[in-house]
Amino acid sequence: MKTKHILMATALASLSLMTTSCGSDFLDKAPSGNYTAPTFYSSDKAVMKGVEPLYNKAWFNFNRRALIGMGSFRANDGWNPYVSAEFANFKVTALTEDLSLAWSALYNVVTMSNATLANLEQYCTNDVTPSVKNAAEGECYLMRGWAYFYLLRGWGDNILFEDNNKLVQNPNQPLNTEADVLKFIIRDFRKAEQLLPETGTDHHASKYAAKAALAKALLAQSGWEEGSTTDHQRNEATLQEVKNLCDEVINSGQYSLMNNYEDLFKAQNNDNSETVLAMRWADPNSGEWGAMNATYSDLAFPEVTDVNVWGGNLSPSCDMLDYYNEDPADSIRRNATWFTPNTYYSYIKKSDGGYTY
């Protein structure tokens, strides 16, 4: 019995020490080694860095594999019997992993955009230049709009939300109609256009990236909106706005077509005159998983890279090759987009003098 009393007394003593140690001063410790929202947004540089995950990590599980399957494979440009084959074979179901990863990634972009907008509004100090804050907010609206644009075209009706906290408190939200989702997208792109600068810096978007996105969304709306079209005719007023926006982008002086189509795919032209808006990924050899571009794994094959890849079974579709072969001059595009037998590529394995497939 004495032993039990001693053990109980020791336990109670320990509990009292634990209880008295947990005062408010003990709990209110500033994290060491990590940034926190209340103190992070204190300079122009920090604000610009704060939106950069919207150019990579937020999109990772959409860009990694689903984008190719939902895009090129479903469009019958090509296919791989071992990777995302169900998109080419029209066997996609609600349980298809790439599809669910894409859906969650796109909503990740939405929630990250919402959180960044809230942080910018709440925590930006007076040391942040108003134009820099506006640009960062514009990027959030632009990325959220693009995420919803992909969600709309992939899933139709979707859940719209701008406040993450409200969604957490009440996660049971109704679906919004396609027409309403498209209106939301267009509203976001218009806000982005108003807030973004004339010229982007350090790979950040300019207002012309928003104008281009807005033109694309309005083009969709011109034939989508109920009551505005009859007999499959598009809304002419909307089409005129699309034309005006495209003219503004083209005549901005910031973009131009490259002379050689093949040059688009060369590493040294990663940022070129045709780039309006692009994701920004870390080096696949040294970058953090989730912040680097992992599409190379599915698209490349071991013979042409020192990175771990498995794209050797990727092939163009017969229809794709037929389109290229209709015009012999189109071998320029064919050779640039697909490795063609007996074709020499001077920009592949340059240290070895090039590569012949």
Residue map of PLM features:
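Bacterial Sec-dependent N-terminal signal peptides
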Residues: M1-S32
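Secondary-structure transition into beta-strands, especially the periplasmic turns and strand N-termini
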Residues: H5, M18-S21, C124-Y141, Q240-E248
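An aromatic- and glycine-enriched ligand-binding surface/loop that stacks and positions planar moieties
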Residues: C22-S84, R190-K191, H204-Y357
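Flexible, solvent-exposed coil segments and beta strand-coil junctions
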Residues: S32, V92-T93, N165-L167
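Conserved, well-structured interaction surfaces
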Residues: Y41-N63, W79-W155, N170-K183, R187-D202
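Glycine- and aromatic-rich loop/turn segments at beta-sheet edges
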Residues: I159-N164, L195-H203, S256-E262
